[in-house]
């Protein structure tokens, strides 16, 4: 259980870093929002899912 929690936490941190770097790059690219909105929404959905995936087990582990 602890290993799965640590992996989910690492995935959350990695996804957060990718979104912090990737979203401004997506907005600054020539196509802008219209070409990259699916990628941004997919990343945001993954991030929200990981927040719940980390938050729920954290209440049992801590």
Curated annotation (Swiss-Prot):
Compartments where located: Plastid, Chloroplast thylakoid membrane
CC annotations in GO: chloroplast thylakoid membrane; photosystem II reaction center
Membrane-topology annotation of the record: Multi-pass membrane protein
Stored Pfam families: Ycf9 (PF01737)
Parts of the chain that traverse the membrane: 8-28, 41-61
Keywords assigned: Chloroplast, Membrane, Photosynthesis, Photosystem II, Plastid, Reaction center, Thylakoid, Transmembrane, Transmembrane helix
GO biological process, alphabetically ordered: photosynthesis; photosystem II stabilization
UniProt signal peptide: none
Claim: Coiled coil is one of the keywords in the record: no
UniProt-listed InterPro entries: PSII_PsbZ, PSII_PsbZ_sf
Protein family per UniProt: Belongs to the PsbZ family.
Function field: May control the interaction of photosystem II (PSII) cores with the light-harvesting antenna, regulates electron flow through the 2 photosystem reaction centers. PSII is a light-driven water plastoquinone oxidoreductase, using light energy to abstract electrons from H(2)O, generating a proton gradient subsequently used for ATP formation.
NCBIfam families recorded: PS_II_psbZ
Name of the protein: Photosystem II reaction center protein Z
Gene label: psbZ
């Amino acid at each position: 259980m602890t290993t799965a929690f640590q992996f989910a936490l690492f995935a959350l941190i990695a996804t957060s870093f990718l979104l912090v770097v990737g979203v401004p790059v997506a907005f600054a690219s020539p196509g802008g929002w219209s070409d990259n909105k699916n990628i941004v929404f997919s990343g945001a959905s993954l991030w929200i899912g990981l927040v719940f995936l980390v938050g729920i087990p954290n209440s049992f582990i801590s």
